[in-house]
């Protein structure tokens, strides 16, 4: 039985260091009052939000206000709650903390229970005597000031803690170091014997039989102990087994002859079986543990034509190779203890809607909350989980300090022993961008990495362990063939034509981090920037922009391509276009090489605070950028793409049409078509063909060659049809030598007609028609009231004169949380949806 203390009334007080321990002054004997009075707070939660709610700090995400909140990390903080003893049945009672950030002193009814250092591993105290004797319980948690740890720039070899590093300042966030009780606190009642160290996993035999395999330990002694394993699907018992306990351990399995298999997103369904372990002594039930498991077979196989010394980067699920279409994720917020589950759900569902089938949980962040992994199980999103280590720029060599290794082993062993029970977990990595010297990725022989490898082998050997990401041997794509296995980069558009030459000729096996920057929407600017900074500007010339986007200034890039940008809406339009163009080409180029290349993980999906410019695809305020939708298209199960080497070919256009299919069936015939289009819709050149498809993921279907049109700009649309599957993609070119995309900013204004043609709970269907004489580029769906969160099925699409598109728009009431909860206004009426062509003309249409 369990009692969560999150339902209790908590309060919080800030003090100088050591004041809570001394209590009274030496000179006067009077109680020291502390820095703040007692204020209300919530658990789980963090200190910063409690202070904001109480009026002690300004909104830290507006302007440069986070600078005014940096004092928080330098103080001690007392959490306190008093509550009546809950009614719990058992013989042993434990006080369990699932996550405290970071160094905590624990007191119960004025008795010191102990100190705990570390934010990732749960810890507990036996409180049986106190619980049985007292009717009222008073719990005090004293958090010491945050340790002095590295931000993004520093020395990895000097790392001393297992605290999340990103909020000590990273390129995508500010410095706002979290302190708090960030996970639940419980009182757990148990009998004389209890289940411990549980490991539940699944597999599928060559004959197709599903296996649910369970093992663990039993703490305590009892007679005739056994563990009963039950497996159900939709409440129907599918399999059961009795597992005897010997020497305090048990292990066994239940088999399901014809299981419903779990597949990654896009490859099939994600049925989850309910697995229950019940500890019995004779016929007496002593303890129970419940899990949800998808039955699947996970294997790691070499890439096609990979070097002999390469690690396996191809993921095989249920006997089928899965091309990885992934993203990297940062924590959702600096105040990660205050993130509601609905925020996790909105973010991960948006990732799944983008056709994502893998998320890399980045090592500079956190081991995520339980709800994150549950959602990944439900949505079919595989997890590449990193241990909490990251590069630091000046040196990236993993720390071997004895105290650090002790903390690393403690937190990593706990994470490996708990996260192994999620179906979505696929692989582990030692951390982000760890090196053995200045430039070469670290290997298994480094003592830090060897420690982590041993932990994974001991706790969940069914998951592969990579020494780091990128695991090399070359960190970036190298000019020398054959040494670019798992690489990182690039993180920015490389320019025209260099970007296309570089990625079009790459030979890496896996691309676990790459991306491009783009300015966030005008709505973000209005929320976080003072009005004087609502202008297109370089970060070098504006402190507000520099404070929240220093590394990712796209101003020079975008003005080189588009020329002078007259206002912020136009800057947003131009910047997001180049971000989308950059990422789409990289994703498509990688996929065209499948399965020599087995996947792409875009940096990055989200951001933990609202940047004005960043490499994210999905902003802090739940707005999907153009790059989100262009990557979604490139990740489609059936996708046609164009391979090219420049945006402004001279004399003759040369390219090729490719078809990528998750279903690699041989013998099907594809019908292919391409057309070069003027902006008024005239077909300048075109071609059609058919091809019997081989049984491979990506196929070069047609070569294109035609004289460059006498137009300043033109588009090339490619399409493919194979049975019921069809797809089309559009690419934009120029004949200009400088400011090559400037003519796109000056096209005649299109005339759009929009009508809502269907409506159901949470979904509206719209028909958008271009009634004008010129192309309507990158038509964007926007909800104007800011009371609804919308996610169109497709967005930033182009219509030539006379063309129509039917668009399904999902919506739900926008939720506010954290520092933005003050704006919690319930939505009234219906979403105010508009469709706006490129470029944006106003801050808010």
Region roles according to the model:
Residues 196-198, 213, 287, 294, ...:
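Active-site region of glycoside hydrolase catalytic domains
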Residues 132-136, 215-304:
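Extended acidic/polar, glycine-enriched regions
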Residues 3-5, 11-20, 46-54, 69, ...:
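Accessory beta-strand-rich segments of carbohydrate-active enzymes
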Residues 106-108, 209-244, 652-692, 699-702, ...:
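Beta-strand-rich binding/interaction modules
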């Amino acid at each position: 039985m369990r009692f969560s203390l999150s339902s209790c009334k908590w309060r919080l007080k800030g003090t100088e260091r050591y004041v809570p321990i001394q209590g009274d002054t030496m000179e006067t004997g009077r109680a020291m009052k502390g820095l703040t009075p007692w204020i209300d707070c919530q658990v789980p939660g963090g200190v910063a939000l409690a202070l904001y709610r109480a009026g002690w700090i300004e909104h830290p995400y507006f302007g440069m206000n986070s600078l005014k909140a940096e004092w928080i990390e330098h103080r001690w903080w007392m959490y306190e709650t008093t509550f009546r003893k809950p009614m719990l049945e058992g013989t042993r009672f434990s006080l369990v903390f699932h996550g405290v950030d970071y160094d905590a002193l624990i007191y119960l009814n004025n008795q010191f229970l102990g100190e705990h250092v570390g934010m990732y591993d749960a810890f507990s105290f036996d409180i049986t005597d106190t619980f049985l004797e007292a009717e009222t319980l008073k719990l005090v948690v004293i958090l010491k000031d945050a340790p002095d740890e590295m931000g993004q720039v520093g020395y990895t070899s000097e790392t001393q803690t297992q605290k999340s590093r990103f909020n000590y300042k990273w390129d995508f966030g500010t410095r706002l170091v979290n302190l708090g009780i960030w996970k639940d606190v419980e009182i757990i009642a148990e009998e004389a014997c209890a289940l411990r160290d549980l490991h539940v996993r699944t597999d599928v035999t060559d004959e197709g039989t599903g296996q649910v395999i369970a093992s663990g330990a039993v703490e305590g002694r009892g007679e005739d102990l056994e563990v009963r394993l039950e497996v159900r699907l939709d409440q129907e018992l599918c399999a059961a087994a009795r597992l005897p306990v010997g020497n305090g351990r048990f292990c066994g399995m239940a088999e399901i002859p014809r299981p419903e298999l779990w597949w990654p997103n896009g490859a099939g369904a994600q049925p989850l079986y309910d697995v229950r372990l019940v500890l019995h002594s004779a016929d007496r039930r002593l303890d129970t543990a419940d899990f949800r498991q998808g039955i699947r077979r996970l294997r790691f196989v070499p890439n096609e034509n990979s070097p002999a010394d390469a690690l396996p980067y191809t993921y095989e699920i249920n006997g089928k190779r899965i091309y990885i279409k992934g993203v990297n994720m940062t924590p959702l917020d600096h105040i990660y203890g205050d993130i509601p589950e609905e925020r996790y759900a909105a973010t991960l569902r948006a990732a799944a809607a983008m056709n994502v089938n893998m998320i890399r949980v980045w090592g500079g962040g956190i081991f995520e909350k339980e709800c994150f992994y549950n959602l990944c199980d439900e949505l079919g999103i595989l997890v590449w989980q990193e241990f909490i280590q990251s590069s630091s720029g000046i040196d990236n060599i993993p720390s071997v300090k004895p105290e650090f290794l002790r903390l690393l082993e403690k937190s990593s062993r706990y994470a490996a022993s708990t996260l192994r029970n999620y179906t979505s977990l696929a692989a582990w990595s030692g951390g982000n961008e760890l090196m053995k010297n200045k430039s070469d990725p670290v290997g298994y022989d480094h003592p830090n990495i060897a420690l982590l490898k041993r932990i994974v082998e001991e706790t969940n050997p069914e998951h592969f362990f990579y020494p780091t990401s990128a695991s090399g041997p070359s960190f970036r794509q190298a000019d020398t063939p054959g040494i670019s296995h798992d690489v990182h980069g690039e993180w920015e558009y490389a320019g025209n034509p260099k970007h296309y030459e570089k990625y079009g000729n790459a030979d890496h096996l896996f691309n676990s981090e790459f991306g491009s920057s783009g300015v966030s929407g005008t709505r973000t600017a209005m929320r976080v920037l003072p009005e004087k900074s609502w202008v297109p500007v370089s970060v070098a010339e504006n402190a507000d922009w520099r404070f929240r986007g220093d590394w990712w200034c796209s101003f020079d890039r975008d003005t080189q391509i588009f020329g002078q940008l007259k206002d912020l809406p136009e800057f947003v339009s131009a910047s997001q276009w180049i971000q989308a163009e950059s990422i789409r080409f990289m994703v498509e180029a990688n996929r065209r090489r499948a399965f020599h290349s087995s996947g792409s993980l875009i940096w990055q999906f989200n951001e933990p605070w609202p940047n004005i410019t960043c490499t994210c695809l999905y902003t802090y305020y739940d707005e999907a950028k153009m790059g989100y939708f262009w990557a979604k298209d490139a990740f489609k199960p059936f996708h046609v793409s164009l391979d090219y080497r420049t945006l402004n070919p001279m004399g003759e256009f040369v390219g090729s049409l490719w078809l990528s299919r998750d279903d690699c069936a041989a013998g099907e015939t594809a019908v292919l078509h391409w057309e070069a289009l003027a902006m008024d819709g005239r077909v300048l050149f075109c071609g059609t063909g058919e091809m019997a498809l081989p049984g491979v993921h990506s196929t070069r279907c047609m070569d294109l060659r035609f004289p460059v049109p006498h137009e300043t700009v033109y588009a090339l649309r490619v399409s493919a049809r194979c049975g019921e599957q069809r797809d089309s993609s559009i690419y934009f070119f120029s004949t200009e030598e400088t400011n090559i995309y400037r003519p796109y900013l000056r096209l005649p204004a299109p005339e759009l007609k929009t009508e809502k043609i269907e409506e159901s709970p949470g979904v509206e269907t719209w028909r958008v028609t271009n009634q004008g004489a010129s192309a309507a580029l990158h038509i964007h769906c926007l909800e104007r009231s800011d009371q609804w969160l919308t996610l169109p099925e497709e967005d930033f699409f182009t219509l030539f004169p006379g063309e129509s598109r039917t668009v399904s728009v999902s919506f739900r009431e926008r939720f506010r949380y954290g520092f933005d909860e003050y704006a919690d206004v319930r939505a009234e009426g219906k979403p105010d949806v508009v469709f706006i062509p490129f470029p944006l003309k106003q801050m808010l249409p």
